[in-house]
C-alpha cells in the first residue's frame, strides 16, 4: 500500500516546491489507514530526495525528530540521524516514517568547503489529524463547526446541543468550560484545573457530556485553550506570583508599574485637583492631559530609569580615584587618538565601560558605569596621571553627558508616546461614538484601564502583575512584556484588566509551578475533547505552544487544533502552523467590507479554480530503469486508502507547500452580526457562500437564529432561548443551514486532496455566484447569492441570465430571508433573534440547449436582496471513470517505441518536421504566444511546465485549448508522418482515445486534461527512453538523464540528408534548430566530439558504429570531412576532425563489448585512393574497400608524410568569403618534436573556424582565429591515437607498426609516441618563473601575457597567439594526461578555473587579452574589425562543450595529486572532489531544466548571458558532460 510522499531538497537542503500555491506549509494529507493496517504501519513515509553530488550530501546526515518506530514516543528535541548515501551521479532517498499526526522537522548536517561541519535550519512538516465520528471518517474539509458560549447555555444544555446537531453541524466548539474569574468572562479562567462547578462536579461529567455528543448527536467536540493569561483573581497567583510579570521577575517593568500606579492615583484625585470627572468634549480631555503631565509624569521623574546619574558617578570617581584596583583593564591602542572627541569616547564608554544590562530599564538609576574601569580610562587618556583635579572630573562629566544624550532622547520619545497613547485611549473610552462611553470616572471605572493587577502575596510582598492584552500591528514573535519591549511603559497595550499575563520564561525551569499547572490543564482537556481552539495564538510564545500541544497529542494523537491567529503576515502564519502543528486557521467572512472583498475571501478558501491544472511530474524526477510499474496503479479502490500516484509510473505523490488549512467562519463569537455590520437579510447569502467553500467552516450559535448583536462575553448574563422547537420556520436560517451542511458532507466524502475540489467565483454588483465541483465525478453545486450589505443598496439590481457551458443543472432549492419584525425589546432572561422568515422562491427558468451544450438559468422576477438559489450540476463527459481512463494505458502504448520513434514523439524541431513532411508540417501556432520549439511532446511540455506550476489559466495556450480542439488534433495528426516507425500507431491510438473523451468535456476543462495527457505520455516516453539506454543512465540523476535525452533529440532520420548518400538512416545533428537539415546537419568534428557522450555512454552502440563507418567511407587526403552532406559533397577543411574521429574509434573499441571487431569492418570508399575528386554518381565512387584498421593507418601515415592540397571546387561557390590562399590546405609533422603543424593565416582549420565576412569592417577572408601552427588539442589527440594503436599492436589487433615521413624515412609508432612525450611540456608549458623560459622554448619578447599556463599554439603565424590562454589545453589533458607534469597541470587548471570558466561555458580567450570580445552577434554589421559579422565567435564567448573536457581534466589531476580529493583508501574521489564538480555544474543543471529546448546551448555571452545567435541545444554541449559522468562510472562503479 503506497503512503509515500516525495520531497525534493535543493542544494542547500531546502524543500523544493512543485506547485506555486503562495506562502505555504508542507502538509501531509489526512488519509486514514485501512482498519486492518498493522500497528507498525506508518501513516506516511516522507521520502527526502537528496541530489547526487549536492553540497549537503558531503558527509551528510539527515537529523529528524520523527520517531524511528511506532513504539518510540515523540520528543520534539530528540533527533535521530540518517546517513545520506548519494554519490556524485546517483540520488539518495531518505525515508522519514510518520506514525502519528503532529508537527515534525528535519535538518541536515554536512561538511562544507572549509572542512567545517555545517547545519541547515530546521524544516517543518505537519501531519494532520484523522477525525472520526462513530467510526465514520471526517475529512477536514467536511468539518462544520458551531461555537457556543457555555455560560449562556443555562442549566439544560441538551436542547441547544440537539438544535446544533439538527442543523447538521458535526462539531461543537465550547468556549472554556473552566471556572470563571470575577469578570465572568469564559476567557478569564479562575482555576484551570476546575470545570465550572455550576454544571460539572468533576472532569468525568464533562467526559460523559462529550461522549453523549459523540454517540447520540454525531458531533465532535472542541474547546478553547487559554495559554496566555489567567483571571486577575486566580487564587493560586497569591502563592505563585512568579507566574506573572512583576517587579521581581521583570524589573524592566518597574517604571511601567509606577506609571500605572500614578495614573490610578491621578484618576482617584481628579475632583480634588480640579479636573473634570466626566468628560463631555475634547476640551475636557485636553485638561486631563495637562494634569497627567503635571501630576503623573512630572512627579515620576521617569528619566531616572534611563540616564546615568552624573553627580553620583562623579562623587564615586572622586572617592575611588586613588584606590589600588585589583583588576587591570585593557583598552584599544588608539583610545588616546579620540581623547578629545567626547562623542566617540561616550560611545566607547557606553559599549565597554558600563555595568551589565546597561540601557535596559530596571530600577531608578540602574544605568551605571563601571567606576574602576572608567577611572583607568580617564587616567589613560590623561597620560596616566594621578591628578583628581577639576580637569579630570570635567572630562568625566563631559563624557557622561554625551553618554546621557541619546538616553534622554529615548526618554523624550517614550514620554511623547505615553501621552499619545493615553490621549487616544481615554478618548475612545470616554468620548468616541464607537467606544463604550464609560461615563464618570470612579474608583471602579478609572480614567483608563489598569495595566497591572495588584495584591499582597502570601510572602507579604506587594505585587503588581502585568495584565494581558494586545498591540496594534505587534510582532507576535516578541513578548511585549519582556525586556525587549517597552509596550507597558509606553501604554501601547490594549489591556484586558481581568486577565493576568502568564510568564513562562524559556523553559519549565524558569517557572516550574506554572508549567506543571498548565500541563495538568492540557492533559485534562486533551483526554476529553477532540480538538483545541488556541485562544490568542499569535501572543502565545511558540516554544510554549509546542510544549503543550506535544503533550496534548501524547494523550490524543488525532487532536484537531485550530487557532485564532492574526499575525498580519502570511509568513508568520505559516511559522505558527508548522511549529505548532495547527490543523486550521480561523478566517472570518464578516471581516469583508464589500461584496467584492467577500468574493475574494470565498475565492481564497473555496478551492482551486475550475479547470485547474493538475501536477504531473513531466521532467521533474529521474526515472530508475527498474522503477515499479503498475498499469492498474491509478485505479482508485475505495477500500484502499493509498496516496495515489499521478500515473502508472509509480513515482510517489509530491509533497509541496500549500496554504494553511482554513476554518472559514460565517461569523464568530467575536464578530459583529450581519444586523450590526450589514443587514439582517445578508445573513443567508453570507452563510451559503461560506458553506460551499473547500475548507472547514464554522458559525456561532445565534447566527442562524438571527441574533441582532455581538454579545459581550463579560457583561451578557442572559441565556440562549430554547422555547422555539427545532426546525420551526421562524428560527432564522436553521432550515437552510441544515441542508447546506448536508450538501457539504456529500461533497467532502471523497475530497482528500487539494486537487479533488474546484470552484469558480464571480462577483457582479450585489450578486456573487459560486460553483463548487467534484473533479472526479463532475458533479457540482451552483450557488447564486444576492447580498445585502446595506439598506441603501439598489433593490432593483438584476443579474443577467447565467450560462453554464457543457453542464446540465437542476434547481435544488431557493430561499429569501425576510425580516418580519423589529428587534425584540430586551428580555432579561433569554437572547432572542430578530423575527424573520424564509420565503421559498419559485419561477426559475432553466433550459438546456442540446446543440450548444449549455444550460441557462434565468432568475424569477422575485429574487430579492438576501436570496440564494442552489442548483445541482453535472459536467458533460465527466464521470468516475474518466480520471482512471486518462491516467492509464500509456505504459502499454509506449512499450513498442524505439529511441528513433521516441524522437518523433517527443522532439522534432520545425525544420526537421518540414523536412520529413515535405513542407506540410511545422510547429503549432499558439495565438498571442508563438510556436513551441518542438513539434513533439517536448514542445508542449516546455510551455506547460510554468503554466502548470503557476496554474496559469490565463496563458495564451490555456485560452487556445478552451477555444477549440486544434492542439489535440495536431498532436495526433503530426504523428502520421512517422506512422511507419515502431510503436507510433499505438501512441496515436492512445492519444486519440483520450482526446476523444476530452473533446466531450466542457471547454474550460480541456486545458487541464490536455496537460495531464501530455504529461503522462511524456513521462512514459521518457521512462521508455531511459530503459532503452545503458544501465548507468537508468541509475543516474535527473540531470544526467536530461543530458542523455538530448541524444534522442539529436539523432533522427531526415529526408534531405543522411550519413550515407544512398540510404536514409538516422544521423546526428550538430545542434537544433540551426544544424538540423540538409548539408548543415552533420559535421564530422561535431559528430566525433559528441559520439562518446551522445551514443556510447547511452548504450547506442549501433548508431555509434554507423556514424564511424559512414564517415570512414569519406576519408580523403587523410582527413575526415567537416561538412558531410551525406557523403555527396563533403568538404575537407578541418585539420582536427580526423583526430576526433580516431578518438571516437578508440572510445568505441574500449566501451562497446567486443568493440575491437569494428576494426575489421569493411567500408567502401567515396573517393579513389589518389584523392581524385569525383561526384557521388561517378562509377568510381565506392568502388574500393578498406577496413577501419586501414582507415586508421591511412590517417596516421598521410599526416606523417605531410598533407598538401587545394580544396576541390575552390572558389566563391564553395566558400563566398574565403580568399584564394585560404583554400590551400597544408599539414606536416615537425620531426624534431613529433608535433603536427598545419594551416595558415588565411584559413581556420580547427573548431575555432570563424572566417571574417564583413565588407564594412574590412574583415572578409581574414580568419578570426586561424590557429595555424601546432594546436595543443590536435597534438593531444595525436598522442592518444598513437597510444591506442600501440596498445592494439601489442594485442595483435593492429598490423601496422610504423609510418613513412615526408623525407622518405620511417618512424615507429613507439618512437613517435616517445618523441611527443619528450617534447610536449617543453613546447607548450609557460613556466611561472621567467628564469626557466629557456627550458620551455619561451620567448618573453613575444609578450607573455600569463604564466603557469599551457599555450594554445606552438609556432603560429602570429607569435603572440602562441601564448594566448584558451581552453583547448583541457582536451589534450583529457585524452593524453600522460603528456602533462601533474604539478604544472594543476596550476594551469586552477588558473583556467578562475580565468576561463564561466557559469556554463569556457571563455574562449583570456579576458586580459586585448582581443577579448565576449559578446557574439552574428547580425552585427559595423566597422568594428574584431566583432562585425560575429568575427569574435571564438574570442571570448563561452562555449559549453569545452566545459566537459575541463571538468574531466579537473577531476583527473585533482584526484591524482591532492590527498584531499581522494578517499581514505585513495581508490575513489573524496566527497570534497565530488562536491567541487557538482558546484561547477550548477549552471548546467539550471540551464537544461529551464531551457525550452531541453538541452544545453552551444555558447553563451559573457558570464553565462544568453546569446541569441547560439544554437539553443547542441549535441557536443551535452555529450561532453556525459563524458565526465562516464569517466566516473568507468573508473569507480562496479557495473555499467
UniProtKB/Swiss-Prot annotation:
What are the entry keywords? Cytoplasm, Glycogen biosynthesis, Glycosidase, Glycosyltransferase, Hydrolase, Mitochondrion, Multifunctional enzyme, Transferase
Q: Which GO terms describe its cellular component?
A: cytoplasm; mitochondrion
GO annotation terms (biological process): glycogen biosynthetic process; glycogen catabolic process
**Major site of localization recorded for this protein:** mitochondrion
Q: How is its activity regulated?
A: Activity is inhibited by IGD1.
Q: How does it assemble?
A: Interacts with IGD1.
Other notes on this protein?
Present with 125 molecules/cell in log phase SD medium.
What's the protein here called?
A: Glycogen debranching enzyme
> Organism source for this protein?
Saccharomyces cerevisiae (strain ATCC 204508 / S288c)
Amino acid at each position: 500500500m503506497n503512503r509515500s510522499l516525495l520531497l525534493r531538497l535543493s542544494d542547500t537542503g531546502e524543500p523544493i516546491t512543485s506547485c506555486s500555491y503562495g506562502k505555504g506549509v508542507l502538509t501531509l494529507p489526512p488519509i486514514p489507514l485501512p482498519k486492518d493496517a498493522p500497528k507498525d504501519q506508518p501513516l506516511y513515509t516522507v521520502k527526502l530526495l537528496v541530489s547526487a553530488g549536492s553540497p549537503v550530501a558531503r558527509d551528510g546526515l539527515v537529523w529528524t525528530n520523527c520517531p524511528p518506530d511506532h513504539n518510540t514516543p515523540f520528543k520534539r528535541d530528540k533527533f535521530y540521524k540518517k546517513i545520506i548515501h548519494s554519490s556524485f551521479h546517483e540520488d539518495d532517498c531518505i525515508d522519514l516514517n510518520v506514525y502519528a499526526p503532529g508537527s515534525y522537522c528535519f535538518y541536515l548536517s554536512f561538511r562544507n568547503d572549509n572542512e567545517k561541519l555545517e547545519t541547515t535550519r530546521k524544516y517543518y512538516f505537519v501531519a494532520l489529524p484523522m477525525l472520526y465520528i462513530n467510526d465514520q471518517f471526517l475529512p477536514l474539509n467536511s468539518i462544520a463547526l458551531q461555537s457556543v458560549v457555555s455560560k449562556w447555555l443555562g442549566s439544560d444544555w441538551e436542547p441547544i446541543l440537539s438544535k446544533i446537531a439538527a442543523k447538521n453541524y458535526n462539531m461543537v466548539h465550547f468556549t472554556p468550560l473552566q471556572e470563571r474569574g470575577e469578570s465572568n468572562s469564559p476567557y478569564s479562567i479562575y482555576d484551570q484545573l476546575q470545570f465550572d462547578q455550576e454544571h460539572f462536579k468533576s472532569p468525568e461529567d464533562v467526559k460523559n457530556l462529550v461522549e453523549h455528543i459523540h454517540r447520540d448527536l454525531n458531533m465532535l467536540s472542541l474547546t478553547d485553550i487559554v495559554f496566555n493569561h489567567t483571571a486577575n483573581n486566580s487564587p493560586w497567583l497569591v502563592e505563585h506570583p512568579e507566574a506573572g510579570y512583576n517587579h521581581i521577575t521583570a524589573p524592566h517593568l518597574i517604571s511601567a508599574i509606577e506609571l500605572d500606579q500614578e495614573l490610578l492615583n491621578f484618576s482617584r484625585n481628579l475632583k480634588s485637583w480640579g479636573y473634570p470627572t466626566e468628560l463631555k468634549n475634547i476640551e475636557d480631555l485636553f485638561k486631563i492631559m495637562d494634569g497627567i503631565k503635571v501630576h503623573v509624569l512630572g512627579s515620576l521623574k521617569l528619566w531616572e530609569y534611563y540616564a546615568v546619574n552624573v553627580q553620583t558617578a562623579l562623587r564615586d570617581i572622586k572617592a575611588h580615584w586613588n584606590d589600588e584596583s585589583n583588576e587591570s583593564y585593557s583598552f584599544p591602542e588608539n583610545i588616546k587618538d579620540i581623547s578629545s572627541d567626547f562623542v566617540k569616547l561616550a560611545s566607547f564608554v557606553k559599549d565597554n565601560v558600563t555595568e551589565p544590562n546597561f540601557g535596559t530599564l530596571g530600577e531608578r538609576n540602574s544605568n551605571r558605569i563601571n567606576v574602576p574601569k572608567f577611572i583607568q580610562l580617564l587616567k589613560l587618556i590623561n597620560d596616566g596621571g594621578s591628578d583628581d583635579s577639576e580637569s579630570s572630573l570635567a572630562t568625566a562629566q563631559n563624557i557622561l553627558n554625551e553618554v546621557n544624550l541619546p538616553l534622554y532622547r529615548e526618554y523624550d520619545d517614550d514620554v511623547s508616546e505615553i501621552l499619545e497613547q493615553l490621549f487616544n485611549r481615554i478618548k475612545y473610552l470616554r468620548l468616541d461614538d464607537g467606544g463604550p462611553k464609560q461615563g464618570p470616572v470612579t474608583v471602579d471605572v478609572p480614567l483608563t484601564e489598569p495595566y497591572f493587577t495588584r495584591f499582597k502575596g502570601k510572602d507579604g510582598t506587594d505585587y503588581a502583575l502585568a495584565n494581558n492584552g494586545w498591540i496594534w500591528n505587534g510582532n507576535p514573535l516578541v513578548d511585549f512584556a519582556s525586556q525587549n519591549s517597552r509596550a507597558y511603559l509606553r501604554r501601547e497595550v490594549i489591556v484586558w484588566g481581568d486577565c493576568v499575563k502568564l510568564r513562562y520564561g524559556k523553559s519549565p525551569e524558569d517557572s516550574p509551578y506554572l508549567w506543571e499547572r498548565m500541563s495538568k490543564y492540557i492533559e485534562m482537556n486533551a483526554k476529553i475533547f477532540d480538538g483545541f481552539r488556541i485562544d490568542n495564538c499569535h501572543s502565545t510564545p511558540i516554544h510554549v505552544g509546542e510544549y503543550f500541544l506535544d503533550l496534548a497529542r501524547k494523550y490524543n494523537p488525532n487532536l484537531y487544533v485550530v487557532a485564532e491567529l492574526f499575525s498580519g503576515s502570511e509568513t508568520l502564519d505559516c511559522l505558527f502552523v508548522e511549529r505548532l502543528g495547527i490543523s486550521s486557521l480561523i478566517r472570518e467572512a464578516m471581516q469583508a467590507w464589500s461584496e467584492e472583498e467577500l468574493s475574494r475571501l470565498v475565492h481564497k478558501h473555496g478551492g482551486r479554480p475550475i479547470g485547474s491544472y493538475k501536477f504531473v511530474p513531466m521532467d521533474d524526477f529521474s526515472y530508475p530503469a527498474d522503477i515499479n510499474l503498475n498499469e492498474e496503479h491509478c485505479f482508485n479502490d475505495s477500500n484502499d486508502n493509498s496516496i495515489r500516484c499521478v500515473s502508472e509510473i509509480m513515482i510517489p505523490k509530491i509533497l509541496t507547500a500549500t496554504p494553511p488549512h482554513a476554518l472559514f467562519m460565517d461569523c464568530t463569537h467575536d464578530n459583529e452580526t450581519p444586523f450590526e455590520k450589514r443587514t439582517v437579510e445578508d445573513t443567508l447569502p453570507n452563510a451559503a457562500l461560506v458553506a460551499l467553500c473547500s475548507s472547514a467552516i464554522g458559525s456561532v450559535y445565534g447566527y442562524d437564529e438571527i441574533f441582532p448583536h455581538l454579545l459581550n462575553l463579560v457583561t451578557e448574563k442572559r441565556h440562549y432561548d430554547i422555547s422555539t422547537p427545532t426546525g420551526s420556520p421562524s428560527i432564522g436560517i436553521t432550515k437552510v443551514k441544515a441542508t447546506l451542511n448536508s450538501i457539504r458532507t456529500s461533497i467532502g466524502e471523497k475530497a482528500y486532496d487539494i486537487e479533488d475540489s474546484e470552484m469558480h467565483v464571480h462577483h457582479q454588483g450585489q450578486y456573487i455566484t459560486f460553483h463548487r465541483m467534484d473533479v472526479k465525478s463532475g458533479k457540482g453545486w451552483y450557488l447564486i447569492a444576492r447580498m445585502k450589505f446595506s439598506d441603501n443598496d439598489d433593490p432593483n439590481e438584476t443579474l443577467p441570465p447565467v450560462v453554464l457551458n457543457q453542464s446540465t443543472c437542476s434547481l435544488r432549492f431557493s430561499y429569501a430571508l425576510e425580516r418580519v419584525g423589529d428587534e425584540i425589546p430586551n428580555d432579561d432572561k433569554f437572547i432572542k433573534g430578530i423575527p424573520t422568515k424564509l420565503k421559498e422562491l419559485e419561477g426559475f427558468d432553466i433550459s438546456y440547449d442540446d446543440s450548444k451544450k449549455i444550460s441557462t438559468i434565468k432568475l424569477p422576477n422575485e429574487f430579492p436582496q438576501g436570496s440564494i438559489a442552489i442548483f445541482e450540476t453535472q459536467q458533460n463527459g465527466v464521470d468516475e471513470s474518466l480520471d482512471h481512463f486518462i491516467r492509464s494505458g500509456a505504459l502499454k502504448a509506449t512499450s513498442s517505441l524505439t529511441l528513433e520513434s521516441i524522437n518523433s514523439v517527443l522532439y522534432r524541431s520545425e525544420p526537421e518536421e518540414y523536412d520529413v513532411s515535405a513542407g506540410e508540417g511545422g510547429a503549432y501556432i499558439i495565438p498571442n504566444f508563438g510556436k513551441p520549439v518542438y513539434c513533439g511532446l517536448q514542445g508542449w511540455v516546455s510551455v506547460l511546465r510554468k503554466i502548470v506550476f503557476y496554474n496559469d489559466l490565463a496563458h495564451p495556450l490555456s485560452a487556445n485549448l478552451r477555444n477549440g480542439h486544434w492542439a489535440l488534433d495536431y498532436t495526433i495528426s503530426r504523428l502520421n508522418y512517422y506512422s511507419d516507425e515502431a510503436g507510433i500507431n499505438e501512441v496515436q491510438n492512445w492519444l486519440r482515445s483520450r482526446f476523444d473523451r476530452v473533446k466531450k468535456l466542457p471547454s474550460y476543462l480541456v486545458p487541464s486534461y490536455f496537460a495531464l495527457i501530455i504529461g503522462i505520455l511524456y513521462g512514459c516516453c521518457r521512462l521508455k527512453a531511459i530503459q532503452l539506454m545503458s544501465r548507468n543512465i537508468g541509475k543516474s540523476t535527473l540531470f544526467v538523464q536530461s543530458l542523455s535525452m538530448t541524444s534522442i533529440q539529436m539523432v533522427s532520420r531526415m529526408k534531405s540528408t543522411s550519413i550515407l548518400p544512398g540510404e536514409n538512416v538516422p544521423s546526428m545533428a550538430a545542434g537544433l534548430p540551426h544544424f538540423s537539415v540538409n548539408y548543415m546537419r552533420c559535421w564530422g568534428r561535431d559528430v566525433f566530439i559528441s559520439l562518446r557522450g551522445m551514443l556510447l555512454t547511452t548504450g547506442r552502440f549501433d548508431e555509434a558504429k554507423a556514424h564511424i563507418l559512414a564517415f570512414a567511407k569519406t576519408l580523403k587526403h587523410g582527413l575526415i570531412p567537416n561538412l558531410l552532406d551525406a557523403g555527396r559533397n563533403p568538404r575537407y577543411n578541418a585539420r582536427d576532425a580526423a583526430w576526433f574521429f580516431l578518438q571516437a574509434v578508440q572510445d568505441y573499441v574500449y566501451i562497446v563489448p567486443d568493440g575491437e571487431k569494428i576494426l575489421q569492418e569493411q567500408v567502401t570508399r567515396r573517393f579513389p585512393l589518389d584523392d581524385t575528386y569525383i561526384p557521388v554518381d561517378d562509377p568510381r565512387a565506392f568502388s574500393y574497400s578498406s577496413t577501419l584498421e586501414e582507415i586508421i593507418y591511412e590517417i596516421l601515415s598521410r599526416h606523417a608524410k605531410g598533407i598538401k592540397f587545394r580544396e576541390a571546387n575552390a572558389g566563391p561557390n564553395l566558400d563566398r568569403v574565403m580568399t584564394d590562399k585560404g583554400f590551400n590546405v597544408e599539414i606536416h609533422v615537425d620531426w624534431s618534436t613529433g608535433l603536427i603543424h598545419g594551416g595558415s593565416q588565411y584559413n581556420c582549420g580547427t573548431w575555432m573556424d570563424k572566417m571574417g565576412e564583413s565588407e564594412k569592417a574590412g574583415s572578409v577572408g581574414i580568419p578570426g582565429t586561424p590557429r595555424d601552427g601546432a594546436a595543443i588539442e590536435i597534438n593531444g589527440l595525436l598522442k592518444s591515437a598513437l597510444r591506442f594503436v600501440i596498445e592494439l599492436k601489442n594485442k595483435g589487433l593492429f598490423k601496422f607498426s610504423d609510418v613513412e615521413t615526408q623525407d622518405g624515412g620511417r618512424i615507429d609508432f613507439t618512437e613517435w609516441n616517445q618523441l611527443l612525450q619528450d617534447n610536449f611540456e617543453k613546447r607548450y608549458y609557460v613556466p611561472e618563473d621567467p628564469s626557466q623560459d629557456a627550458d620551455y622554448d619561451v620567448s618573453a619578447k613575444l609578450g607573455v601575457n600569463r604564466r603557469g599556463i599551457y599555450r594554445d599554439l606552438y609556432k603560429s603565424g602570429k607569435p603572440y597567439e602562441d601564448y594566448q590562454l584558451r581552453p583547448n589545453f583541457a582536451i589534450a589533458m583529457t585524452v593524453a594526461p600522460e603528456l602533462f607534469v601533474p604539478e604544472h597541470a594543476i596550476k594551469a587548471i586552477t588558473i583556467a578555473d578562475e580565468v576561463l570558466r564561466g557559469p556554463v561555458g569556457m571563455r574562449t580567450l583570456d579576458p586580459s587579452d586585448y582581443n577579448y570580445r565576449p559578446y557574439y552577434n552574428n547580425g552585427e554589421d559595423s566597422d568594428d574589425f574584431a566583432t562585425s559579422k560575429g568575427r569574435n565567435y571564438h574570442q571570448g564567448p563561452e562555449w559549453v562543450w569545452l566545459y566537459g573536457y575541463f571538468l574531466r581534466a579537473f577531476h583527473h589531476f585533482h584526484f591524482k595529486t591532492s590527498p584531499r580529493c581522494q578517499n581514505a583508501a585513495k581508490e575513489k574521489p573524496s566527497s570534497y572532489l565530488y562536491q567541487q564538480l557538482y558546484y561547477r555544474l550548477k549552471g548546467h543543471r539550471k540551464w537544461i531544466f529551464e531551457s525550452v529546448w531541453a538541452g544545453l546551448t552551444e555558447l553563451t555571452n559573457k558570464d553565462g548571458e544568453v546569446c541569441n545567435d547560439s544554437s539553443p541545444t547542441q549535441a557536443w554541449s551535452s555529450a561532453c558532460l556525459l563524458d565526465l559522468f562516464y569517466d566516473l562510472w568507468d573508473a569507480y562503479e562496479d557495473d555499467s
